[in-house]
């Protein structure tokens, strides 16, 4: 077995919940999902995110393998609000005069995002489809050379259109 096969095997075991012991004191997925739902409902009430359409229940034929009893199958859209970023027109240099971090997929590092080299201003937020993502947002590169790269915001930031954000 080569290093890549070993890595893939370990990841597969982790996804199936077979890598570490499941402890009752850690709680269940159902409890975590209830907490996420309460927080999401509060964000909707505070008008920080929009209410999303309910997703269909997961059917038996969609389940690829068994998971621990304390886990739960769910759709990615159920864990948060997803949205793509935007790139303000470079024909408006005033959009880039400010101190609001603007992340591109090349800034994703599969870790925490604490520093972003490019910025936009309040005008860009007001006049374009840019959204300010809160601390804790999970970012993912959707296409291009960086597809699949991830990051978790440790600062509030906006993103370009090649990046989607999940606000848990």
Cite the ranges covered by each PLM segment.
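Non-catalytic DNA-recognition/assembly elements of restriction-modification systems
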Residues: 9, 13, 18, 61-86
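Glycine- and aromatic-enriched periplasmic loops at the membrane-periplasm interface
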Residues: 161-165
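Extended, domain-scale alpha-helical bundle/helix-rich regions
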Residues: 2-63
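Sequence-specific dsDNA recognition surfaces
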Residues: 57-62, 77-92, 106-135, 153-154, ...
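A generic structural signal for residues embedded in beta-strands
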Residues: 140-141
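Short, Lys/Arg- and Gly-enriched loop/turn segments at beta-strand edges
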Residues: 147-153
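Short, intrinsically disordered, charge-balanced linker/junction segments flanking boundaries
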Residues: 72, 166-168
